[in-house]
Regions:
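Glycine-enriched alpha-helix->loop->beta-strand junction motifs that scaffold or abut catalytic
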Residues: 154-158, 240-247, 262-268, 293-296
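Metal-coordinating catalytic core of metallo-dependent amide/deamination hydrolases
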Residues: 99-231, 301
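His/Asp/Glu-enriched, well-ordered alpha-helical/loop segment
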Residues: 263-273, 277-358
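Metal-associated gating/positioning segment near the N- to mid-region
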Residues: 45-114
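Active-site glycine- and acidic-residue-rich loops that bind
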Residues: 135-146, 230-235, 239, 247-249, ...
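C-terminal cap of metal-dependent C-N hydrolases
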Residues: 6, 333, 337, 349-378
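Histidine-rich, glycine-flanked metal-binding segment
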Residues: 1, 8-48
Length: 378
């Protein structure tokens, strides 16, 4: 396959030319046009490496499209997969939550179904993107470690993150924000919220630190990429580094992001944060970290189409020094490096032909075609 007349977004430059794919790999590219009649005309669009998503909880909404509605697993997985490739994502880590902040939630009911759906569809070759698992461990819960121990040795597990959403911790250092969020989410009265908050603090006191230490040790022993989550202080970051974290997910302050970089961790922020212009919870904005040169990886989080959109917005912004190739690395090469996937994430000879052809229509980035290992999947 030859793709002609495209702007190739390489590691550190953009060149106008053509690219040839053979046997699922990039055979060659050139700053010239192919004259072969079978070459696909890219019509001057951008040819990018396939996007790599490390943290999406998009799968949840297809398994439970409405409260108490349970959707068939393979149908849910197929719909989720279609949305991923339509967003230019060719490698996706589906984030599944281990443990829940409230007994009786949908997370535990869906966990086994989601894990099995990801693995079965991947093994059977039904997915258009390559799907792996990201285990999001809610530390202050008695069910977290037993569930984690059942899943950690599954072949599809590529990443683990350590979360603590208890009152006064990380994202909820301001306990009034904690109360506002969970009281609204669960429709609690003031008395019910008081009891819920007390219960969560008791659970955190019992389970958070033992689970944090044990899960981190198990990841180190297996060389599975470990991520912190919502670190707010230099002390949080120092602890995360000591535990072996290589990724800092969503640091909530500039100080935490700076400390994460100093400790050699990849700083990951949400692409919706870039598109919307700030954090929905009032934390440090991703564009602020970009302007300080502290942004390494973007994740679509809860909105898959935000990933490529955010990369182009960063390249366009005047308050940072990112070129387009550098911005595209945030959604391709850098996440690949964080996971040790050295066969993808960049347009280079010998790499996997995971590719995205996109055009700019005014301020909108339109994805026209997507290939995974040289096969067109969108």
């Amino acid at each position: 396959m030859i793709i002609n007349n495209v702007k190739l977004v390489l590691d550190d430059e953009v060149v106008h030319g053509s690219l040839e794919v053979h046997d699922g790999r990039i055979l060659a590219f050139a700053e010239s046009q192919s004259r072969l009649p079978q070459a696909l005309d890219g019509e001057g669009g951008w040819l990018l490496p396939g996007l790599i998503e490390l943290h999406t909880d998009n799968l949840d909404k297809f398994f439970t499209p409405r409260p108490k509605v349970d959707w068939p697993a393979h149908s849910a997985m197929s719909s989720h997969d279609a949305m991923m490739v339509a967003s230019g994502i060719t490698t996706v880590l589906d984030a599944v939550a281990i443990g829940d902040v409230r007994d009786g939630g949908d997370r535990l009911e869906n966990l086994e179904k989601m894990v099995n759906a990801v693995e079965e569809t991947q093994k059977r070759g039904l997915n258009r993107a390559e799907h792996r698992l990201h285990l999001r461990c809610e530390l202050p819960h008695h069910t977290t470690l037993p569930l984690f121990e059942k899943l950690i040795d599954r072949e599809s597990v590529s990443m683990v993150s350590l979360m603590d959403h208890s009152p006064g911790q990380r994202q909820y250092a301001d306990r009034s924000k904690y109360r506002d969020y969970y009281q609204g989410k669960y429709h609690l009265t003031h008395d019910e919220m008081d009891r819920f908050e007390a219960e969560q603090m008791a659970l955190a006191a019992t389970w958070s630190q033992p689970n944090r230490q044990t899960i981190a040790a198990m990841c180190r022993a297996r060389r599975i990429a470990l991520a912190s989550h919502d670190d707010a202080t230099e002390a949080h970051v120092a602890e995360s580094h000591q535990l072996g974290s290589v990724i800092a997910e969503f640091p909530t302050t500039l100080a935490a992001a700076q400390a994460s970089r100093q400790h050699g961790m990849h700083v990951l922020m949400g692409a919706p944060n870039i598109v919307r212009g700030g954090s929905h919870s009032g934390n440090v904005a991703a564009h602020q970290l970009a302007s300080h040169g502290l942004l390494d990886i973007l994740s679509s989080d809860y909105y898959p189409a935000s990933l490529l959109d955010a990369a182009f917005r960063i390249a366009d912004a005047e308050d940072n020094a990112f070129t387009l190739p550098q911005a595209i690395r945030l959604v391709s090469q850098h996440p690949a490096q964080a996971l040790g996937l050295d066969d993808r994430g960049v347009i280079a000879e010998g790499k996997r032909a995971d590719l995205v052809l996109a055009h700019r229509r005014g301020e909108h980035i339109q994805i026209n075609h997507v290939w995974r290992q040289g096969k067109r999947v969108f």
